[in-house]
Amino acid sequence: MKRDVDARGRACPIPIVELMRAIRESSVGDEVEILADDRAFPSDVRAWCKKTGHQLLSLTEEGATLSAVVRKENVP
């Protein structure tokens, strides 16, 4: 299953908080796509995935919008 989260217009740390909530509510293997426009988001999402063990599948930028797709992994 894929979930979509729109965190555009929200400053750090809210996009990561919204991602955490979506991952928590997802099943292992599900993907969450999050849209953000906070310029700190790319480094934040990379660090969060590294820290938590969830997999960052893609990180793209189109205009002012950043898009990350994260897969929930089977981690404690």
Locate the predicted segments by residue:
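Amphipathic, hydrophobic secondary-structure cores in small proteins
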Residues: 10-55
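Hydrophobic residues in beta-strands and at strand termini
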Residues: 7, 36, 70-72
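Residue-level marker of intrinsically disordered, low-complexity segments enriched
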Residues: 3, 12-15, 67
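Short amphipathic
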Residues: 1-8, 33
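C-terminal structural segments of small proteins and small subunits
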Residues: 46-76
